[in-house]
Amino acid sequence: MDVLEVAARATGTGPVCDACLGRLVADRSFGLSNAERGSALRTSLALRDDEDYEPVETADCWVCEGRCTEFDEWAERAAEAVEDVEFATYNVGTRPPPLIEENEALLREEAGLDDDAGEPFKSEFNREVGKRFGRLTETEVSFDRPDVQFTIDLAEDEIDAKVNSTFVYGRYRKLERDIPQTEWPCRECKGSGRQGADPCDHCGGSGYLYDDSVEEYTAPVVEDVMDGTEATFHGAGREDVDALMLGTGRPFVIEVEEPRRRRVDTDRLQADINAFADGAVEVEGLRLATYDMVERVKEHDAAKRYRAEVAFDADVDADALAAAVEELEGTTVEQYTPNRVDHRRASITRERDVYEATAELDDARHAIVEIHGEGGLYIKELISGDEGRTEPSLAGLLGVGAEVTALDVVAVEGEDEPFEREEFFRE
C-alpha cells in the first residue's frame, strides 16, 4: 500500500502524533526518527490533497496518549537512579500500558496494515529513552549483558534500575592445609550451629566445619572495594581441604552483585587481598572479567599436576617403584566413587587418564610421587587403590599398602588451551 494512503487512513482515525504516525512505516528510509517520518508524511499528505497543514500536539494523540513527549523525562529519571553507580554500558526496557498496545493495534488495522507492520511503541520508547540516557551519562548501549539495566513501567509510573554483577578473575595459591575453597556448612546442623536448643557438638556452634576458606580470604575484600551487596567465589574445580595449592595457582572468578564501583585498580586489589589473607592464601594475575569467564572456569577442561608424599606399609625398592610408576604413566584409570566422597557424589565408575608419573624414594617406606593427570583424577585413590575401587593403583602394582600423607597441587592448566582468553576480559 502507498505510504500516503496509509497516512491518510491513519490520520482519519483522530489526532495521531508524528511519532505514532511515523512508526507505521518505520521500515521505510533509514536515518530518520519516527517523528520525522510522521511529520514528512503529514506534510506530503497536505501537499497531495492541497489541504491546510494541521500539526497534532503529541499530548492530544489518542494512540500514545501523549507518552511520546516523555522520552527526556524518563532518561533523566534513569540517570538519577544510578547517579552513584559506576557503569559503562546500559539497556532500557519498557512495559507499556495495555491500552496503548491496544490503540496501536487498532491504528494498524484502520490503516490497512498487518499486525507486525512498522515498529511497536515499546521498541521506540526503549530506543529514544536509551539514546537520551546515553548522551546524559556518556555511556554505551549494550544488548548483551549491560552494566545497568532499566525497566520502565509506564502504567505504574515507576523505573526499576538493576545493577548487574561485575567479575574479577585471578589465580590463588593456598599455602596452609585444612582450608576449604569455600565455606563448608556443618552436615549435622546444616549450617545453623544448633541442635535443638543447644549448640551443635559437631561444629562447636559455628555452623561451619572450618574457621576459614579461600573464599573468606578473598571475596569480602573484592566486595568491599567494589562496594557491592554480595560476593560469590567460583573456582576451576577444588583441591582437597588438606592439600596445598601451589605453583601457578588455581583459576577463580569472584562475582560481585550490585557493585557501585567497577573501575578498580586490580594491582592494589591484589595487594589488599594478600595482606588480608596474611600468608594463608595469596592471589595473582587479577583482571576485570566478563560473565563468560565464570562459565570458563567452571566448565573448561583442566589438567592438574600433583606432588604427593607417600608412605608404604612395607619396604619398597627403587626398581619396583620405578616399574610401577612406568606402568601408571599413560594409562586410563577406572575409579569407582571413592569411599571418602560417596556421601556427596554419584556412585559411578569414572575413567581418567594419567599423562605422566614419576617417583623418587626418600627411604624404603617413603617416596615423593608426581602425577600429571586429567581433571577429576582422584590422586589419593590412585596411590592407595581405595580398597579396589581404583584400578590400576600404585599400591596394587607394588603389592604394598600405600597412603598419601601430604598432597600438593602444583599446576591447574587448560587441557587444550589456556583458561585465559582476551575476549573474556574487560579493560
Curated annotation (Swiss-Prot):
InterPro entries: HSP_DnaJ_Cys-rich_dom_sf (IPR036410), PsdUridine_synth_cat_dom_sf (IPR020103), Pus10 (IPR005912), Pus10-like (IPR039894), Pus10-like_C (IPR048741), Pus10_THUMP_arc (IPR055174). The active site is at D240 (nucleophile). It is an enzyme of class 5 (isomerase). Pfam families: Pus10_C (PF21238), Pus10_THUMP_arc (PF22023). The keyword RNA-binding applies. Keywords: Isomerase, RNA-binding, tRNA processing. One of its GO terms (molecular function) is tRNA binding. Substrate binds at Y306, Y378. GO terms for biological process: tRNA pseudouridine synthesis. The keyword Ribonucleoprotein does not apply. Its EC number is 5.4.99.25. It catalyses: uridine(54) in tRNA = pseudouridine(54) in tRNA; uridine(55) in tRNA = pseudouridine(55) in tRNA. Belongs to the pseudouridine synthase Pus10 family. HAMAP family: Pus10_arch (MF_01893). Responsible for synthesis of pseudouridine from uracil-54 and uracil-55 in the psi GC loop of transfer RNAs. NCBIfam families: pseudo_Pus10arc (TIGR01213). This is tRNA pseudouridine synthase Pus10.
